[in-house]
From Swiss-Prot:
Catalyzes the N-acylation of UDP-3-O-acylglucosamine using 3-hydroxyacyl-ACP as the acyl donor. Is involved in the biosynthesis of lipid A, a phosphorylated glycolipid that anchors the lipopolysaccharide to the outer membrane of the cell. This is UDP-3-O-acylglucosamine N-acyltransferase. GO terms for cellular component: membrane. One of its GO terms (biological process) is lipid A biosynthetic process. It comes from the Bacteria. Its EC number is 2.3.1.191. It is an enzyme of class 2 (transferase). Keywords: Acyltransferase, Lipid A biosynthesis, Lipid biosynthesis, Lipid metabolism, Repeat, Transferase. PROSITE patterns: HEXAPEP_TRANSFERASES. Belongs to the transferase hexapeptide repeat family. LpxD subfamily. The keyword Transferase applies. Homotrimer.
Amino acid sequence: MAFTLEEIVQRFGGEIVGDRAHRVGNLAPLDQAGPDQLAFLANPKYLAQVETTRAGAVLINAADLAKLASPDGRNFIVTPNPYAYFARLAQAFIDMATPKAKRGVHPSATVDSSAQIAATAVIGPNVTVEAGVAIGENVRLDANVFVGRGTTIGAGSHLYPNVAVYHGCRLGERAIVHAGAVIGSDGFGFAPDFVGDGDARTGSWVKIPQVGGVSIGPDVEIGANTTIDRGAMADTVIEECVKIDNLVQIGHNCKIGAYTVIAGCAGIAGSTTIGRHCMIGGAVGIAGHVTLGDYVIVTAKSGVSKSLPKAGIYTSAFPAVDHADWNRSAALMRNLDKLRDRIKALEAAVASASGDKA
């Protein structure tokens, strides 16, 4: 299905420069787009590609359009944020191209008679819905999804195959949960009950029942194989519009503030609070019982062991270097205490010599 630039602007806004009747049917990168495709410029370092692209039209901001040597004869949609415009337009194209699932409950699904399921919901093959569950309008549960007792899933949410949502959890409207994610599994809570020391130590770990739940706000997206533990007594809370990548672990009683994004393989220990509009890089590790303020950015592979209350960018990871350089640096680090002692001795000797001269 193709649309004129005029039709696109009527729905998404922006200003057309060029042929308002030109039709485009999908999106493509600047260096690959053809006359029936729409491209976008989000980074001015690719401005040269706009000069040579074959795209039928380009999403661009006014400042970058003004830098073009020869914009005449081509089509543009001018918008302050071409990247966000592209994202919304791409979603619209996908929605139109995706076949609509058949509403209702698949014959192979197991649904408790007390569950409340909206007539517009889609319950796929082998889905299990336990007692007291409430599923809103236009919710889609793909194959093998499990929804535990007393859980609520808000309207417009989509749970992909093999998602498990344990009992007593709440998912807000338009939640997207990708395949294999687990929401509401037990938090990692064990009380030590040991007597003695060393080889004479006896006893065991006593499991602490996790009686809280998980509360997820609207417009949250959770990546594949991510796990969000239920709270020990109160809920683990994920606020509105949080975006969580694949393979992220969020411990019990954490609170993740609205509009925060968390990249893949990050691990957040229990009872940690992360503020609003934060950015957590890939493979970041955050210790338990710490607080990150609003607008905190933690770069990839950093370890956070204490609270970071002030907005800013924080880094503790060591970037990759040549292997031989790393070995030399590691050798120096192992000997820093000896070097410190030598420097102190030299400073003392200099001070003593200066005193003798005086």
